[in-house]
């Protein structure tokens, strides 16, 4: 059994990674915010709730705050992904308490496979959020939060009514 560790992030944390070598997380971990993990290439193994999910291009995992998880490369030499972690506080800048409650009901833990068109659109949303974090100045924080909400709403759209592997 792997050890568990808390992995804190700011209200919004986004990272693109293209890794050309094996990488196994040394410990299980959790965050105090949501995580959205989008596979863009290669292969990665996500362990959550005693289930191993094989993630390849187009696979998206949604995890809630404090969901314990970890990932491994196993036999895969390469993987490419975007990961986004965010707190409800980041969304509360633009959403009402009732809107947050409704979103909490809709943003459920799952692993879904997106078709190529959905994958490309989701990638565009990730790039937009990432791009706004590289800018500063007048209204930059509002742009960051607006792009985040757009991405989250597309995640909800992609996971509603789809065949998901429930977590």
Regions found by a protein language model. Give the residues of each.
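Generic protein-terminus/edge-of-domain signal
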Residues: 1-60, 67
């Amino acid at each position: 059994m792997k050890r568990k560790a808390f992995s804190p992030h700011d209200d919004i944390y986004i990272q693109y990674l293209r890794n050309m070598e094996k990488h196994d997380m040394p410990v299980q971990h959790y965050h105090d915010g949501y995580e959205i993990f989008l596979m863009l290439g290669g292969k990665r193994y996500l362990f959550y709730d005693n289930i191993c999910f094989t993630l390849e291009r187009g696979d998206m995992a949604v995890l809630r705050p404090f969901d314990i998880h970890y990932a491994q490369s196993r036999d895969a030499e390469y993987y490419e992904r975007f990961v986004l972690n965010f707190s409800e506080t980041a969304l509360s800048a633009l959403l009402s308490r009732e809107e947050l409650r409704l979103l909490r009901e809709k943003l459920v833990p799952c692993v879904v496979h997106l078709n190529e068109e959905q994958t490309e659109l989701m990638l565009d949303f990730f790039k937009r959020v990432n791009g706004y974090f590289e800018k500063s100045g007048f209204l930059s924080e509002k742009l960051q939060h607006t792009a985040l909400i757009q991405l989250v709403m597309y995640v909800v759209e992609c996971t509603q009514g789809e065949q998901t592997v429930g977590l």
